[in-house]
Structures are given as structure tokens and as C-alpha cells.
Regions:
Chain A
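Conserved mixed alpha/beta catalytic, RNA-binding, or beta-rich assembly cores of soluble enzyme
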Residues: 2-10, 14, 19-57, 61, ...
Length: 314, 272
């Protein structure tokens, strides 16, 4: 399969089950909502070292938020249910509670699985906090020096998918970055999906473990590192001098597949040789995003089957 | 099965009747004959509902009452579901102790509307009498949940001893929120004297100005973040008349009643 002269490899991205929450931050204006969201999602690129993966999902107009103010929707994922409330509580506590003018709401109101988030955070109020029931939901008014911080008592929990990905193999670093930026721009604001890495782009795709250093959880993906082409078992076709990766987490398979389709299509620009994806041979992750199926418009979860082709490891 | 049950008053009432048999959930499973046989009470004497009302429809979730019903007491008492539509004015204790469902009164209501209710909604297009959302006689708590929306005025002691829930109205008589334990009284216009006397943790929101009792003390002027959420909900759900200026405006916060634990508040909107 080719798109505008760019080969789409017959392979798949292998992804894992995660647990996620959607956090709605509102503020006096978009600036302060963004400020808080940027802090909340800071240092949240990979569960490997950050304990969670988080990013801005999209901006919300006042008509879309519970309190009629400008807002930002954030998705945050962890590998297990137990750590999800811990990460959400510590991040909201340090980055939303502290931020001028913000309030914080659940973005998954239909989820039957509820996490106590505002409930523990209310104790910052040292007994001066007060609750209000509004439309069947409890909210906590926590007195702070600025005035009051408002937070919903419980947040919904969702089963998510983490580690959707594709790799852009380009003739130069400039082209790879242009293509990756175009891909990120095309996926920006898509519902149910985040790109947790800086600017949505990863330059240091990794493999599991290491060849030289025992105990490493991950190390450089040497098969896709152009400087190592002649001294390792390379996966790079001729003419490829730079590779960038896009990693996606989402609330469901279809959201990721939909975003991947848009992103891959946008990345097919002159100077890009091929698009491939990272997997572990299909043995570890239950979610397989087959690039050619996705680009053919098949966006639903398919029966698992390992594909042939080079196996990059995200 | 019908889409609604309609009860039409056969003749004007010359004396008060207790009509707590009339509630949407209690009528929902009954045939027209069974509905007509339900008792209304004239003091200690039972009167068949069918002698007072003509009944049309059966086994429906919506009940419509028609006629001059101002002498009918306790309609919708302990109602837990369904819809009760009252086309006219209604007597005292409408929706008292109701648990759920919706009651809409197209006219005005007498005293004790929604007293001790714990859920559902009671919307009164006209005025309501004294003690709306308050406590039953001798009880320690008024309403403990649900919403009372009065588009006109409420009488004295609205929301007295309320524990939870929201009462909102265009204007309120003296003693609104008397002895509130918690919950919300929201008044779009004028409020009578001594609002929130004995208030423990309740919120009285005055969108049209208020004479603050001496047992309250000014704390600050700020934008209460929960109010925009609450007022938006009331506007969306009940078409309560709230301007955008109210949603995000400044409010003076008075803490009180300081003769009590002082965790209650009066929030007075500041026109800019």
C-alpha cells in the first residue's frame, strides 16, 4: 500500500490495556485553564518513569463546561486501577488546586466506576470545606487564599488503550519533523485520544531491555537508529536518515485508530519513505492496530493475529 | 393503559379535603375504577375520589388535575415517581414529604408546599404560602433533598430547618432559611427580614439584595465557583431566571448565623 508515494508497511502497532480518567479544568479564561493543564500533564510522557501518561485532549468552549467558563480536557492513564486515583489526586492537588481561578470536574460522567478524587482533596480545607449537591453530584468548596477551589467529589474511570503508535521513516531529520508535525496537527483535538510525548512526537523510540546493560527497562531502538545502520541489525530501508515516532493513548480502540488514520495520512509528504509501527510480535499487547487495515478505513478492533514485517519496539 | 390520567373536579369544593391519595406513583398501577374508589378525607369521613373528581384514563405515569383545587390538601404527599400536573392553584402541603418525580403547579400553592421533601422537583408557577420546603410541625428537619422552584413569591419561613436540597423563588417573605441546617435558598428578588436566623451551614443566595441580619458578619467579596454551576443547572433544568451577570458575578459573603456555628452564609450578588 502506498499513499502519495509513501509506503505503508504491512505491520501493526501493538498496544496495551490502561486505566484512564478525563479531567476537566475550567478557569477565568483559556490562559489559566491551559496553564493548569500544562502543569498537570507535565512529566507524564511514559509510565516507565513518570508513573502515568497524560496530555491535553482538547480545548472546551464555555458552552461545553459544567460552569460555563473556558476549559481544557485532559486524559490521564495508568497501567492499573490502583494507581490511577493516586496519580490523579497528586496531580490535581499540586497543579489545579494551586492554580488561580481554576475549578476541576469529571469528564467521564457516564462511567459507573467512580474514583474518589475530590473527597480526599477536600481535606486541604482543614475542616473549613463545604459540600454542595448539584444535579445529583457532590462538589467540594475548598477555601483557599484566593477564594474557593471547587472540585467534584468523584471522577469516572475508563478502560483505555495505551501505546498506539506509528513510525515515520524519512530521508532527513527535517522531513521527518515536518511530517510528524503535520501528523500531530491533524490529530489535535480528536476526542478520546492524547499524544503524551513532547509536541506529540518521540525521537527516542525504545526497545524492551538492553543488549549491554542488564536491568535496563528500555534502551534505544537500535534497529531504527540511522547512525547504527551498519553495526546493528537495522530495520531501515535505503535512503532513510531519520525516524520519528507518534505514540497515542486513548479511551478506546476506535478513537486511536481514527486518529492514526488521520495522522498517517498527514505524514505522507515528499521525502517520507515509509510508515511502519512498533510491536512485540503480537505476543504482549492485546490491541493490534494494523496500519493497512486502518488506512483502508477499517477502524474497529480485529481478531488478534501477528503480522509479518519489521518489529520496532515503542 | 393511557398516556395520562386526568382528574377533573366535578364541582367547586366548599370545604377542605385531605387528598394525599393523589400522587402520580400511587395512581400509576390502578384502573379508573380503582382510582375512583380511593379515599379523600373530610375530617374523619372518607369521600370517594370518584365523587369529587371525574376520572379519565388509567395506568399512566402522568396525572393531570383540573379545577379550582385550592381547598385540596396534601396532593402529591410522599410521591416517589411519575409526573403530577396541576392545572390551577392547589391547597396546602402539596408535595409534602415527596421522594421523587415531578409536580408542576400552574397556579399558586398554599402553605407547607414541599415541606420535608427529600427528592424530586416541585415547580410552582405562581406563589407559595408559608414554610415552603420547611419542616413538618414538630420535626427537626425541613426538606432534605430535591428542588422547589417558585416563580412567584414564597411566604414566611421558606426553607426553614432545611437539611439539603434547593429552594428558589422570585421573592421571599420574612424568616427565609430560619434554622437552616444546610441546603440552598436562592432568591431572585426581595427577601424579607431576618433571613437565615439560626442558620448552621446553609446558603442563602440573594440576587436582588438583602438586609443582612446582625448575627452575620461580612467576610469578603468574591466569585463563588459553585454558584455558576448551580445557577446554570437551575436555568437549564427549571428555566430559573438567571442572567449571565449572576453566573460569574461578584458576591458579598456574610458568614453566619454567628449565634450558631457560623458555617452558614448569605451570598449577596453585586451589580456592577
Amino acid at each position: 500500500m502506498e499513499i502519495r508515494g509513501v509506503q505503508i508497511d504491512d505491520t501493526f502497532a501493538e498496544a496495551f490495556g490502561m486505566r484512564g480518567a478525563r479531567i476537566i479544568i475550567t478557569a477565568k479564561n483559556e490562559k489559566w485553564a491551559r496553564e493548569s493543564a500544562n502543569k498537570l500533564t507535565g512529566f507524564a510522557t511514559s509510565v516507565i518513569a513518570c508513573k502515568c501518561e497524560a496530555a491535553v485532549e482538547r480545548e472546551l468552549a464555555p458552552s461545553e463546561t459544567p460552569d460555563g467558563r473556558p476549559g481544557i480536557s485532559v486524559l490521564l492513564f495508568t497501567m492499573d486501577s490502583d494507581s490511577l486515583p493516586k496519580r490523579v489526586i497528586e496531580r490535581i492537588g499540586q497543579t489545579v488546586l494551586t492554580c488561580p481561578t481554576t475549578a476541576c470536574f469529571d469528564g467521564l460522567p457516564d462511567s459507573p466506576d467512580r474514583l474518589a478524587i475530590g473527597k480526599p482533596l477536600r481535606t486541604f480545607g482543614d475542616g473549613f470545606q463545604a459540600s454542595k449537591m448539584i444535579d445529583g453530584q457532590r462538589y467540594w468548596r475548598v477555601p483557599v487564599m484566593e477564594g474557593e477551589f471547587l472540585i467534584q467529589e468523584t471522577f469516572g474511570k475508563a478502560k483505555g488503550v495505551g501505546g498506539g503508535n506509528f513510525l515515520i521513516l524519512a530521508e532527513s531529520a527535517e522531513v521527518a519533523l515536518d511530517a510528524a508535525e503535520a501528523a500531530v496537527e491533524s490529530m489535535a483535538g480528536m476526542p478520546g485520544v492524547i499524544l503524551p510525548f513532547p509536541g506529540g512526537i518521540v525521537r527516542s523510540g525504545s526497545k524492551v531491555g538492553a543488549k549491554k546493560y542488564k536491568g535496563m527497562i528500555a534502551s534505544t531502538n537500535d534497529a531504527f537508529a540511522p547512525t547504527l545502520r551498519v553495526i546493528t541489525r537495522t530495520a531501515l530501508p535505503e535512503g532513510v536518515n531519520s525516524v520519528l515516532e507518534i505514540v497515542l493513548d486513548g479511551l478506546d480502540f476506535r478513537s486511536i485508530a481514527t486518529a492514526m488514520r488521520a495522522g498517517i495520512d498527514a505524514a505522507c509528504i515528499a521525502g517520507v519513505r515509509s510508515i511502519t509501527a512498533g510491536n512485540y510480535g503480537g505476543k504482549l499487547g492485546p490491541y493490534h492496530f494494523h496500519l493497512r487495515r486502518i488506512m483502508s478505513g477499517d477502524l474497529d478492533d480485529a481478531p488478534k493475529a501477528a503480522s509479518a514485517g519489521p518489529a520496532a519496539q515503542p | 393503559m393511557s398516556d395520562r390520567i386526568t382528574l377533573t373536579l366535578r364541582a367547586p369544593l366548599d370545604r377542605a379535603l385531605d387528598a394525599d391519595a393523589i400522587a402520580a406513583d400511587r395512581l400509576a398501577a390502578l384502573s379508573a375504577q380503582e382510582i375512583a374508589a380511593l379515599p379523600l378525607w373530610d375530617g374523619r369521613n372518607a369521600v370517594a375520589l370518584g365523587d369529587v373528581f371525574s376520572v379519565s384514563g388509567e395506568r399512566a405515569q402522568t396525572v393531570v388535575l383540573e379545577g379550582d383545587l385550592a381547598k385540596l390538601r396534601g396532593v402529591g404527599s410522599m410521591m416517589s415517581g411519575g409526573t403530577l400536573e396541576i392545572r390551577g392553584s392547589i391547597g396546602s402541603a402539596v408535595g409534602a414529604r415527596m421522594l421523587g418525580g415531578a409536580i408542576a403547579v400552574q397556579g399558586s400553592a398554599g402553605d407547607d408546599a414541599g415541606s420535608a421533601m427529600s427528592g424530586g422537583s416541585l415547580v410552582i408557577a405562581g406563589n407559595a404560602g408559608d414554610r415552603a420546603g420547611g419542616a413538618l410541625q414538630g420535626a427537626s428537619k425541613g426538606m432534605t433533598g430535591g428542588h422547589i422552584v417558585v416563580r412567584g413569591s414564597v411566604g414566611r419561613e421558606a426553607g426553614a430547618r432545611m437539611r439539603r436540597g434547593t429552594l428558589c423563588c422570585a421573592s421571599a417573605g420574612a424568616g427565609a432559611g430560619l434554622g437552616m441546617i444546610a441546603g440552598n435558598v436562592i432568591v431572585a428578588g426581595a427577601i424579607g427580614d431576618e433571613p437565615g436566623a439560626g442558620n448552621k451551614r446553609g446558603s442563602i443566595v440573594a440576587l436582588g439584595g438583602v438586609r443582612v441580619p446582625q448575627t452575620y458578619a461580612y467576610a469578603c467579596t468574591y466569585r463563588p465557583p459553585h454558584l455558576s454551576l448551580m445557577l446554570l443547572f437551575l436555568r437549564r433544568r427549571f428555566a430559573f431566571p438567571v442572567d449571565d451577570a449572576h453566573l460569574h458575578g461578584l458576591y458579598k459573603r456574610y458568614s453566619g448565623d454567628l449565634a450558631e456555628i457560623g458555617k452558614g452564609e448569605i451570598l449577596e450578588w453585586q451589580a456592577t
